[in-house]
């Protein structure tokens, strides 16, 4: 004898509240007896139209945390225990957000990015050319000095490279002080010039 229909209180599994997840119409197909070929989409899965209708902050939040909102039941039916690859993936949000932009605006933005990159390249080339010409000019000045001492002095005060590599000092502070005092000592009436 079949159990009597439940009145008022609890409803059966197929008679639960008439609410279904937005964007899914598979609940009615199952009630009519048609077998479901696809697993039901989770409640957080939106269509591109639903995503476009959201406020920007809501859309951003949904795209960031949408995969955390899965129902346990939907997850169990969507991801069977034996499968390694999930049956349903969160669609890539990039085409939805990019499709909201008009093609002309997108082309203008891309053109601006390309022009800025080209300008940066030109500025970099000019800077490199200037430093190379400066280094060549200083090297020529150093070569044309009358004495080696003058050439070394000029090279110290005008390095060919703008940022010469610093050679680390092998002496510590105490040793450096000792070397300076030795250089300034009187030896045979002559002072070593510093």
UniProtKB/Swiss-Prot annotation:
Residues in coiled coil: none
Query: The organism sits in which domain of life?
Result: Eukaryota
Q: Where is this region: Disordered?
A: 1-45
The record's annotation in InterPro entries points to: LKAAEAR1 (IPR029152)
Here the segments flagged for biased composition (Basic and acidic residues) are 7-18
Protein name (record) = Protein LKAAEAR1
> What organism is the protein native to?
Homo sapiens (Human)
């Amino acid at each position: 004898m079949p159990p009597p229909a439940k009145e008022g209180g609890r409803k059966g599994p197929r008679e639960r509240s008439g609410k279904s997840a937005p964007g899914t119409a598979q609940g009615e197909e199952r009630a009519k007896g048609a077998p479901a070929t696809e697993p039901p989409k989770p409640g957080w899965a939106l269509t591109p139209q639903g995503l476009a209708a959201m406020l920007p902050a809501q859309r951003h939040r949904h795209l960031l945390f949408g995969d955390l909102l899965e129902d346990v039941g939907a997850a169990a039916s969507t991801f069977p225990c034996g499968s390694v690859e999930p049956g349903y993936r969160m669609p890539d949000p990039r085409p939805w957000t990019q499709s909201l932009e008009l093609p002309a605006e997108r082309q203008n933005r891309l053109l601006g990015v390309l022009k800025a990159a080209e300008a940066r390249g030109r500025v970099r080339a000019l800077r490199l050319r200037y430093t190379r010409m400066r280094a060549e000019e200083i090297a020529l000045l150093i070569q044309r000095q009358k004495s080696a001492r003058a050439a070394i002095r000029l090279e110290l005060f005008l390095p060919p490279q703008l940022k010469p590599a610093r050679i680390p000092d092998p002496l510590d502070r105490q040793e450096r002080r000792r070397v300076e005092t030795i250089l300034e000592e009187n030896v045979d009436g002559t002072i070593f010039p510093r």
